[in-house]
């Protein structure tokens, strides 16, 4: 009887997403999952603090509407665990691993706790190879490392989600391994669109009756979207990561892990932090910001067993890259793709800032001498143009030397040539999407900086694939003129 008493507690207070539970006997360990019934629904609470007075403070993984003081809470004696393995493929789950696609239980043979240790130092793998994305500006100037961590930084509405969807289209669809997509605090509509896109593309397989099935599917989706309470948004990235880790460690696969959006993970942590009674740090963020980010990011890594290549969209509040949330994530990434509002205002998409995006693998040893030199010459031309813009704005183009005029003309062509029609945006633009191989990208840009295409008009370079298409477009423009 004593064990039953000790494993059952009572709710003593409810403050939004934070619930205090009192136990008579032994207290549940920190990070333990507690369960209670909320109007017929299972509500999971995660222990965050021991307050003394036999009370633990917990974070709710779902809405606390309808909870009452004194109602019983059961200690499960374990952490929140989510289903892992092949049965998760083709399914949509929430933070606690429950299916939300209305297709019955997941039926996985195994579950795994969402909190785990990062791989040991000795288990880490450090080979450097390029992950081809087919997107010119990325492959040329800030290439992605296979098994690396990639961050897409950008303010509101500059194209992070479209870029991540294009990367899913270009990489995940042709990728032999498994992908996991974690939707953290973003729009439910986008999650729905993505699911149907996967169905249409065959990334999620269908059975004879046309219903989605795990057999032959290549992606698992975990969602804790904008409408979810902060507890769910703060943990859903870990749930998705746990599923990805299983495929890496148990099946030795090369896994693609997409997260949209890491900032919402931080934001949810800051919402909960104040309710937990922690004193906020800079800009009102939680004092544990660096720790929370480190614990998540250090688990996303490649080991000797398999690799996780992660692409993370990171919202930049008020376009300020020095804000603590994006600034904390910079240190963990191998490549950063920064989206710039000024470039999107010019109508150049993807609105990647070629001078602000970086990559660890842009070295001659990894990409080759020709690629490296071409990338640096492109950046040099764009940088010269940037420094001349003030002079042009005040005095006009006529005051520039002939050499500078040529630099400006080439830079403007390069700027337009870095734009590219996306497959996922085809429905909006009416322009068929383009996938450009790295060799074509390097060859095309080398020719442009060498001045081989100085005779082509600027407009010919806008929204095309390789240089051959720009030449075709120039002929077409000339014919129309």
UniProtKB/Swiss-Prot annotation:
Leader peptide range in chain numbering: none
Instruction: Name one matching Pfam family.
Output: ATP-synt_ab_N
Name of protein: ATP synthase subunit beta
The UniProt entry's sequence similarity note says:
Belongs to the ATPase alpha/beta chains family.
Q: How does it assemble?
A: F-type ATPases have 2 components, CF(1) - the catalytic core - and CF(0) - the membrane proton channel. CF(1) has five subunits: alpha(3), beta(3), gamma(1), delta(1), epsilon(1). CF(0) has three main subunits: a(1), b(2) and c(9-12). The alpha and beta chains form an alternating ring which encloses part of the gamma chain. CF(1) is attached to CF(0) by a central stalk formed by the gamma and epsilon chains, while a peripheral stalk is formed by the delta and b chains.
Enzyme Commission designation: 7.1.2.2
**Record: residues binding ATP:** 154-161
For this chain, the annotated S-S bridges are none
Regions that span the bilayer: none
The answer, when asked if Ribonucleoprotein is one of the entry's keywords, is no
The family database entries (PROSITE patterns) matched by this protein are listed as: ATPASE_ALPHA_BETA (PS00152)
Where in or outside the cell? Answer: Cell inner membrane
Keyword ATP-binding assigned to the entry: answer is: yes
The Gene Ontology CC terms held by the record are: plasma membrane; proton-transporting ATP synthase complex
Source organism per UniProt:
Novosphingobium aromaticivorans (strain ATCC 700278 / DSM 12444 / CCUG 56034 / CIP 105152 / NBRC 16084 / F199)
């Amino acid at each position: 009887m004593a064990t039953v008493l000790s494993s059952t507690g009572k709710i003593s207070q409810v403050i939004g997403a934070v619930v205090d539970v009192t136990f008579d006997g032994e207290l549940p360990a920190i990070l333990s999952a507690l369960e209670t019934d909320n109007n017929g629904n299972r509500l999971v609470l995660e222990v965050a603090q021991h307050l003394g007075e036999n009370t633990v403070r917990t974070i709710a993984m779902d809405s606390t509407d309808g909870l009452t003081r004194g109602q019983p809470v059961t200690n499960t004696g374990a952490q929140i665990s989510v289903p892992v393995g092949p049965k998760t493929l083709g399914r949509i789950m929430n933070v606690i691993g429950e299916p939300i696609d209305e297709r019955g239980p997941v039926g996985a043979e195994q579950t795994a706790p969402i909190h785990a240790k990062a791989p040991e130092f000795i288990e880490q793998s450090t080979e450097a190879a390029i992950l081809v994305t087919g997107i010119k500006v990325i492959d040329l100037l800030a290439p992605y490392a296979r098994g690396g961590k990639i961050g897409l930084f950008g303010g509101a509405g500059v194209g992070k989600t479209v870029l991540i969807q294009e990367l899913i289209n270009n990489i995940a669809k042709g990728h032999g391994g498994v992908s996991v997509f974690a939707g953290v605090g973003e729009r439910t509509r986008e999650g729905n669109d993505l699911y149907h896109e996967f169905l249409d593309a065959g990334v999620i397989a269908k059975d004879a009756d046309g219903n989605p099935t795990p057999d032959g599917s290549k992606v698992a989706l975990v969602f804790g979207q904008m409408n979810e309470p902060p507890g769910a948004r703060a943990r859903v990235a870990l749930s998705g990561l746990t599923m990805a880790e299983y495929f890496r460690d148990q099946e030795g696969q090369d896994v693609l892990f997409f997260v949209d959006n890491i900032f919402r993970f931080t934001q949810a942590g800051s919402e909960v932090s104040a309710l937990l009674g922690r004193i906020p740090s800079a800009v009102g963020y939680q004092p544990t910001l660096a720790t929370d980010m480190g614990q998540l990011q250090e688990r996303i890594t490649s080991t000797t067993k398999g690799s996780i290549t992660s692409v993370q969209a990171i919202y930049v509040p008020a376009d300020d890259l020095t804000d603590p949330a994006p600034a904390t994530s910079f240190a963990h990434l191998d490549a950063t793709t920064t989206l710039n509002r000024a470039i999107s205002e010019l109508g150049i998409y993807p609105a990647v800032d070629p001078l602000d995006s970086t990559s660890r693998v842009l070295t001659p040893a990894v990409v080759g001498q020709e690629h490296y030199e071409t990338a640096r010459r492109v950046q040099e031309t764009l940088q010269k143009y940037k420094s001349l813009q003030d002079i042009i704005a005040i005095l006009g183009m006529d005051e520039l030397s002939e050499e500078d005029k040529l630099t400006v003309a080439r830079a403007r062509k390069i700027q337009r040539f870095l734009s590219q029609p996306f497959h996922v945006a085809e429905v909006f633009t009416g322009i068929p999407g383009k996938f450009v191989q790295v060799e074509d990208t390097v060859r095309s840009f080398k020719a442009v900086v060498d001045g081989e295409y100085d005779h082509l008009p600027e407009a010919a370079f806008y929204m095309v694939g390789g240089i051959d298409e720009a030449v075709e477009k120039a002929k077409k423009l000339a014919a129309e003129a």
